[in-house]
């Protein structure tokens, strides 16, 4: 009978450790989701800034002087 009680205690201990591990992993997932969301916002801002650059400020490929080796 004692071995059954010992096995139950072992299982309860393992379950407790698993609960702690799951909660820690969940917190990491939450942090990473927030980080990804911030990075997506920053990327969107960068894309919008690139789209807002006036084409007149950039020379076309026809206007570019060729490199010296041509």
From Swiss-Prot:
Top-level taxon of origin: Bacteria
Pfam families: SlyX (PF04102)
Family, as annotated: Belongs to the SlyX family.
HAMAP family reported for this sequence: SlyX (MF_00715)
Protein name stated in the entry: Protein SlyX homolog
Organism of this sequence: Shewanella frigidimarina (strain NCIMB 400)
Gene assigned in the entry: slyX
């Amino acid at each position: 009978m004692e071995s059954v009680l010992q096995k139950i205690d072992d299982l309860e201990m393992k379950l407790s450790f698993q609960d702690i591990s799951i909660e820690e992993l969940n917190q990491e997932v939450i942090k990473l989701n927030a980080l990804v969301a911030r990075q997506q916002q920053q990327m969107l801002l960068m894309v919008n800034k690139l789209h807002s650059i006036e084409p007149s400020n950039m020379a076309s490929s026809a206007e570019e002087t060729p490199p010296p080796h041509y």
